Design a protein with these regions (language model features):
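Short, surface-exposed beta-strand/loop "edge" segments at domain boundaries and coil↔beta transitions
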Residues: 44-55, 107-114, 131-132
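ADP-ribosyltransferase catalytic core
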Residues: 62-130
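Weak global preference for isoleucine
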Residues: 7, 54, 79, 100-101, ...
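ADP-ribose/NAD+-binding catalytic cleft of ART/PARP-like enzymes
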Residues: 1-69
Length: 140
């Protein structure tokens, strides 16, 4: 389930410690708070995930000037359906990815917002409370 929140209310209730220093306006004012909500993330390897699979674009390329895209660049991309994640693996633009990570997010893990042209794409602003031990690699 995803519950609409104002980021100020979320911060007051959960007192998040973000995984990085957030730029102004990030996370945005209107967010969704997950509660036992499934998401999927593409992984570099087909049989395991690593901490590199959870690096944001901004972490992976810190010298790049992100401009207005910085709020999205510090977040992580998620997909809201396994079927759509599997389809994405077949697209040329995602050829560097070989696997799919299934994860279930809760309020202390951070907030999400639907972003981009595809309704299945979400950006996740992660907190330090997120535990990578609760992830599952899907068979491809």
């Amino acid at each position: 389930m995803l519950t609409p929140y104002k980021i100020a209310d979320y911060c007051k209730e959960y007192q998040p410690e973000w995984t990085c220093t957030m730029p102004d306006g990030c996370p945005p004012d209107d967010v969704l708070v997950p509660s036992e909500h499934p998401f999927f993330r593409l992984a570099k390897q087909s049989d395991t995930y690593t901490t590199d699979d959870f690096k944001s674009y901004a972490e992976a390329d810190p010298q790049r000037h992100w401009g207005e895209q910085l709020p999205l660049a510090v977040g992580l991309s998620l997909i809201d359906s396994e079927t759509k994640a599997r389809r994405n693996l077949k697209l040329p633009m995602f050829r560097q990815y070989q696997g799919i990570i299934a994860l279930v997010l809760n309020p202390t893990d951070g907030v999400v917002r639907q972003t981009g042209a595809h309704r299945s794409h979400y950006t996740w602003w992660r907190t330090r409370k997120f535990q990578m031990s609760n992830l599952t690699m899907l068979k491809i």
